[in-house]
Amino acid sequence: ISATKQWALNTGKDWKPYWEDQDTKLIHFIGKDNIVFHCIIFPVMLQLHGNILPTNVPANEFMNLEGDKMSTSRNWKLEMEDYINDFIKPENGGSQLADTLRYYLTAIAPESKDSEFTWKGFQDANNSELVSIFGNFINRALVLMHKLCNGKVPPLHNELLDELDHATIEAIQQSKQKVEQLLEDYKFRDAQFEVINLARIGNQYMQKKEPWILAKQLESNPSAQQLINNCLHICLQLTANLAILSNPFLPFTAKKICYLLKVVDKILDWENAGSMKLLSVGYSLRAPELLFRKIEDEEITKQIEKLKAAAVNKEPIVQTTPAPAVKPEIVFDDFAKIDL
């Protein structure tokens, strides 16, 4: 509550609606070691002070680090300042690497059991998922649009849509409901997975449609350009949907996608998700830019070595003091004289 008061003081807003308004939905996200306090003791305190009670108290398990429990006393921890210097500074990757950390922490969130942060896992999440699946799909869609559709959103020729087209459109339209329900159920890992899976569906769709092959058939196949248009129209609408759906998890990336699509951030409103009309036909889009960079093995080795070195440098100093001299023993008869 004090943090809310300070925030309100800094921003000139009222803190009371957040803790006293009966229409407010209050959720307490906690660790499993605080369940008793947040479910029994704290609600009593809130009620006595006239505050609203939490609607739900999702409790997470513990997250370990490289095979051991995190510990500030042993320096077995991750320093945000180090991460900013090593990954987020413009020369090292910029804000997109902030999203990478958010993504990995969500992917391994200990929602139902203890989990573990490893630098190798962090690298794999970035390179194998954000770069190879999410970023790769969006980059391919924009590259092919500029190459095969003059840099503009092509029209959709409904009469030529086949089963795969309809299935992909349906996946886009159902994505909002899937992700939304998982978020409402506090299943953030699964919600984020659905977002990446939609990008995976886009990659598979593009691979099966092969618009680059159709481009070689323009003279022999009168429908080739229309089929290319259909493929890239669907891929671009899927890209716009990825911006909306990824916004809760990858906010910097979502805004970067909006920049590439030349749309205002207003498109990120959640109600727009699932639409196949986010981008207007004939609208010019910007040239593609890579959303994520690969993280090299050398960078990961450096982080692991830094972690181990910091822990070694803070080994606890054991203070040894000589044991007091043992006093002479007494016989039982002397002990029996004591009035207890």
Where are these regions (language model features)?
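Basic, alpha-helical terminal appendages of large translation-related enzymes
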Residues: 115, 181, 186, 196-340
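Catalytic adenosine-cofactor/nucleotide-binding cores of aminoacyl-tRNA synthetases and other
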Residues: 61-160, 263-291, 295-299
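Short active-site loop/helix that positions an aromatic residue
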Residues: 1-9, 39-49
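Conserved, charged catalytic cores of large soluble enzymes
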Residues: 6-17, 112, 138-179, 199, ...
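Glycine-rich phosphate/pyrophosphate-binding loops
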Residues: 8-11, 50-63
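Active-site cores that bind ATP or allylic diphosphates and position pyrophosphate for catalysis
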Residues: 1-32
